[in-house]
Regions:
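Gly/Pro-rich hinge or "lid" segments in bacterial periplasmic/extracellular proteins
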Residues: 1-38, 43
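Short, solvent-exposed loop/beta-turn-alpha elements that line the ligand-binding surface or hinge
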Residues: 1-3, 67-72, 83-90, 129-137, ...
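A bilobed periplasmic-binding-protein/Venus flytrap-type ligand-binding module shared by bacterial periplasmic
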Residues: 19-22, 70-97, 101, 110
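Short helix-initiation/N-cap motifs at beta->coil->alpha
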Residues: 35-47, 175-185
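Extended ligand-binding regions for polar small-molecule ligands
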Residues: 86-109, 228-248
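Append "and occasionally in soluble cytosolic enzymes with long acidic Gly/Pro-rich linkers
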Residues: 91-168
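Bilobed periplasmic-binding protein-like "clamshell/Venus-flytrap" ligand-binding domains
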Residues: 138-149, 241-278
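Periplasmic binding protein-like
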Residues: 169-217
């Protein structure tokens, strides 16, 4: 926020206000300002919105709510994910079994979250598909595993469903909840075998994922020190490739290996929806999952 035709003028827990630049050098938006009020109690009962992950946005005033209808929708590139740390407690095939259970048991389709809020992931990014394995019958899960996870709130349902599902496989899942939107130094990640969170994706998906591997405090707890150092060396080599397509293909290979090694799997993406009362025009959702207001316009107020 702060680039393009709008600049950020106010940012609080309840309000984000954008105003158009007076001297923007390209096409000017039709609206002078856009205010985004974060008011989950206003919509939560009827629309099922999550105050931690606002996937439903309604344009208008509270008195307009009975009149609103959907004007734009899409599926996020961002995703909630599961990472797995292999060790003497969790082998490669045991980790693959956990992932197979998640994606093939119907677990993701039966989560107790809002209707049409999420869709089960089949790829990390479009074309970066999740691998599938034939897990040998003799592979049994450990007696206990520990899961750490943070917000959004939809992961509460995921954690409980996973605990129930793994219990049917003879595995007790101990759960640690980190009440924040990101990992930090206070998270007991060193105790966890499994870790869940979410990864927002911006206008440059490949760059976002590359920086995620480099910078998120999660990864030093997923890999051994030597493996993580080797990963950084691989990312350095990828970054030096002069051709963009080659860089993207090389980064895809890195993440494909992480998924095949049962280190990472996406869980689900979000359905984003914009609703508005009659007369609100031109608001759309971009292919990247961003809300576009530059062509939005309102009719002249009635006298």
């Amino acid at each position: 926020v702060g680039t393009g035709p709008f600049r950020l003028t106010q940012f609080t827990a309840e309000l984000v206000r954008l105003e158009s630049h007076d001297y923007y050098h390209l096409r000017h938006p039709l609206l002078k300002a856009v205010e985004y009020w974060i008011t989950p109690p206003l919509f939560e009962k009827d629309l099922g919105t999550s105050c931690q992950h606002p996937v439903q946005i309604t344009i208008g005033k509270p008195e307009d709510l009975p009149l609103v209808s959907q004007v734009s929708s899409g599926i996020s590139l961002g995703f909630c994910y599961l990472t797995l740390r292999k060790s003497s407690r969790l082998t490669l095939w045991q980790a693959r079994k956990v992932i197979t259970i998640i994606h093939q048991s119907g677990l993701l389709q039966t989560l107790e979250v809002g209707e049409n809020l999420i869709t089960a992931s089949n790829a990390l990014l479009p074309g970066w598909t999740i691998p599938q394995w034939e897990v040998p019958d003799e592979v049994k899960l450990p007696e206990t595993l520990t899961l750490a996870y943070h917000l959004p709130v939809e992961l509460h349902a995921m954690a409980e469903q996973l605990r129930t599902t793994l219990a049917a496989e003879g595995c007790e899942l101990k759960i640690i909840f980190h009440h924040a939107k990101n990992w930090d130094d206070t998270t007991p990640l060193a105790q966890a075998d499994l870790m869940m969170g979410d990864r927002l994706i911006g206008e440059a998906p490949e760059y976002t994922l590359e920086q995620w591997l480099r910078c998120d405090p999660l990864w030093p707890h997923v890999f051994t020190a030597s493996t993580y150092a080797h990963l950084h060396s691989t990312l350095d080599a990828v970054q030096l490739m002069p051709d963009e397509e080659n860089r993207h293909n090389a980064l895809k290979a890195v993440f494909t290996q992480l998924m095949d090694n049962a280190t990472l799997t996406p869980l689900f993406n979000y359905h984003y929806r914009i609703s508005a009362p009659p007369g609100v025009n031109g608001v759309r959702l971009t292919p990247r999952g961003w809300f576009e207001f530059t062509e939005a316009w309102l009719p002249t107020p009635s006298q």
